[in-house]
Amino acid sequence: MSFYNHKEIEPKWQGYWAEHHTFKTGTDASKPKFYALDMFPYPSGAGLHVGHPEGYTATDILSRYKRAQGYNVLHPMGWDAFGLPAEQYAMDTGNDPAEFTAENIANFKRQINALGFSYDWDREVNTTDPNYYKWTQWIFTKLYEKGLAYEAEVPVNWVEELGTAIANEEVLPDGTSERGGYPVVRKPMRQWMLKITAYAERLLNDLDELDWSESIKDMQRNWIGKSTGANVTFKVKGTDKEFTVFTTRPDTLFGATFTVLAPEHELVDAITSSEQAEAVADYKHQASLKSDLVRTDLAKEKTGVWTGAYAINPVNGKEMPIWIADYVLASYGTGAVMAVPAHDQRDWEFAKQFDLPIVEVLEGGNVEEAAYTEDGLHVNSDFLDGLNKEDAIAKIVACLEEKGCGQEKVTYRLRDWLFSRQRYWGEPIPIIHWEDGTSTAVPETELPLVLPVTKDIRPSGTGESPLANLTDWLEVTREDGVKGRRETNTMPQWAGSSWYYLRYIDPHNTEKLADEDLLKQWLPVDIYVGGAEHAVLHLLYARFWHKFLYDLGVVPTKEPFQKLFNQGMILGTSYRDHRGALVATDKVEKRDGSFFHIETGEELEQAPAKMSKSLKNVVNPDDVVEQYGADTLRVYEMFMGPLDASIAWSEEGLEGSRKFLDRVYRLITSKEILAENNGALDKAYNETVKAVTEQIESLKFNTAIAQLMVFVNAANKEDKLYVDYAKGFIQLIAPFAPHLAEELWQTVAETGESISYVAWPTWDESKLVEDEIEIVVQIKGKVRAKLMVAKDLSREELQEIALADEKVKAEIDGKEIVKVISVPNKLVNIVVK
């Protein structure tokens, strides 16, 4: 057979690995450890697409490489299986979300196994398994005991069609829900919150210790959003009311000409004049229909209403009209801002819109034309005049503190984590509300609080989840006869994914989240690979929970993930018409190398775009495995380009990778394998071992494969192949194409055992040194020949070889040699006349 028969070989070795538990996690305490983690998937009905295996292949290469280097390797996989999609599907079809999820998991697992990933399936976790979410609930009870889980009446992003509130991060820029694209409105509701803000400073500072890309760290820093400034208290004219504003620029107080409250601010109704009451009420209603993202969009038209009230500027006593505007959020800062229109563009636009005064307090711009937002010396600012920013801030803060109307303050953009969902398909929150007004956590001995099975999973629409309808589950009675009601909200999908990497370490422990010694052995995760779309939410939440567990003494490290790598996106093929509109692939035909719209005949431009069902350009890995084989898919996705780049899928590239594997197969199976080394491939082999080893370490898998190709080309020029080099090469390709490598290993090693734990090859540095070098021969300064000679020859030896060369002899025939200049390892110059 002269080609790689993937249909026969790949299932054979997948069966072998499963039967022999080849990838069971090592427990030899004398070995170093390596924990390679993938972001576990949500098991959707659509199954895997070709984007999933990119990251999975990367961690699999590292895991196979580290096993060969003698490491204990933990390489697990599991399922992030709670969440809205399964519940939405269940409501649409009448199916049980648990059954739907189980079917999807079985399909995902089949697809993953068909790709030859070396997961230890004994450590599989599923966030919907009560034995798993027992510990999710346990973590929640600990947060509750420490005051970090609390209830609050907060304005939430309510989605009527989903029957639930969603987090700010799940609202799209257009004001619709990420899931389903439904309208989002603001609605006050009783919600569970987690006090992530208590960890803001640690979450910020500890980023410096992590081997993550600066772009991801910056995204987290910006999300946490630390600001240093001052709280300033403004009294409301003619009343005993006052409100506080946080500002990073208290030095511009002399330029504050009006104040703006969030429409939801608690003072609004109390200070609104009777003349303005109707307009204020109308505006508050309109604001409630908008999401935070829409309200804070800098590009949107500025709207607002005057309350009829005035605030008193604490530094100059001037009256400042108090407005309400939807760009101020009650949930951010104090829900109030002091407007300095001369030096803030949004305030400037608002002032121009409503004809409010603009007072310059920093010199350097023309504030009639636009806000001046750079720094400058202070003007029109009484005792601050002539001062720079730093000096002015220090002086004004001292003044405010002396007057008792302000103080220095550090704030964070980060908000507490909205942790409850009004849905069925999630972890029940283990809290009981008693009729005497108290609430208690479900005792640890009664965990897990199991999600009851029901077919009635439609949201109540009242803000409670479907669990409110299940009386037998809902109502409880204490030993003293006091009646209670279970919490009906469930946890968000983020809950189970915030700690799953810990459970992999000890997945069958019934007594605790995980054994302390095992946690010490395996933490932190050595490399975590996944999409950059999780840069803020999942990673921030996981870091928060990890730090909390560190404070409890459960985990031994301050951070969960030492190294993070975000793979790029695999783009699909798409087509655009002359307007730039995307055209689905089933509407396109190819003629003479160009692409045309089947219906209109218009010639289309081919362009990469994100794979989507609507464009019909999603590539199913099942189809690729069937036609080309899993090893081809693995090699192709790693060879496409740098791992972190977004690159378009190419059928031609796939075929090229398949041809390469066929060449590898033929090289090993058709060459004569020598027991003795003839030295012909010394340099090529040792260069390949060195390069592939270093490139795997640095995740440059595309260049590692390119080097493997270089060796195949060199080896194909030889009639025979030294057996140790054949073995070493098979070991080098094994992390990339494990099925092919296992099969070829049997032909040269004849052990009958897997290649997985054979020691990784090493290189001989002395073999990397060139034995021969190329020198040039010049005659009267012009190059007439290039010769391969032994390295470090003397001048005399070089001269002798050059003069004996046939080409050189022909050039100097009949001429007198005046002089010969020899430069060892470089050139011979012959002067003739």
Curated annotation (Swiss-Prot):
The keyword rRNA-binding does not apply. InterPro entries: aa-tRNA-synth_I_CS, aa-tRNA-synth_Ia, Leu-tRNA-ligase, Leu_tRNA-synth_edit, M/V/L/I-tRNA-synth_anticd-bd, Methionyl/Leucyl_tRNA_Synth, Rossmann-like_a/b/a_fold, tRNAsynth_Ia_anticodon-bd. CDD domains: Anticodon_Ia_Leu_BEm, LeuRS_core. It is an enzyme of class 6 (ligase). ATP binds at K613. One of its GO terms (cellular component) is cytosol. The keyword Transmembrane helix does not apply. Gene3D superfamilies: HUPs, Isoleucyl-tRNA Synthetase, Domain 1, Valyl/Leucyl/Isoleucyl-tRNA synthetase, editing domain. Transmembrane segments: none annotated. It is found in: Cytoplasm. Its main location: cytoplasm. Keywords: Aminoacyl-tRNA synthetase, ATP-binding, Cytoplasm, Ligase, Nucleotide-binding, Protein biosynthesis. Its EC number is 6.1.1.4. A motif ('KMSKS' region) lies at residues 610-614. It catalyses: tRNA(Leu) + L-leucine + ATP = L-leucyl-tRNA(Leu) + AMP + diphosphate. GO terms for biological process: leucyl-tRNA aminoacylation. A motif ('HIGH' region) lies at residues 41-52. It comes from the Bacteria. One of its GO terms (molecular function) is aminoacyl-tRNA deacylase activity. Pfam families: Anticodon_1 (PF08264), tRNA-synt_1 (PF00133), tRNA-synt_1_2 (PF13603), tRNA-synt_1g (PF09334). SUPFAM superfamilies: Anticodon-binding domain of a subclass of class I aminoacyl-tRNA synthetases, Nucleotidylyl transferase, ValRS/IleRS/LeuRS editing domain. Belongs to the class-I aminoacyl-tRNA synthetase family. This is Leucine--tRNA ligase. It comes from Streptococcus pneumoniae (strain ATCC 700669 / Spain 23F-1). The lineage of its organism: Bacteria, Bacillati, Bacillota, Bacilli, Lactobacillales.
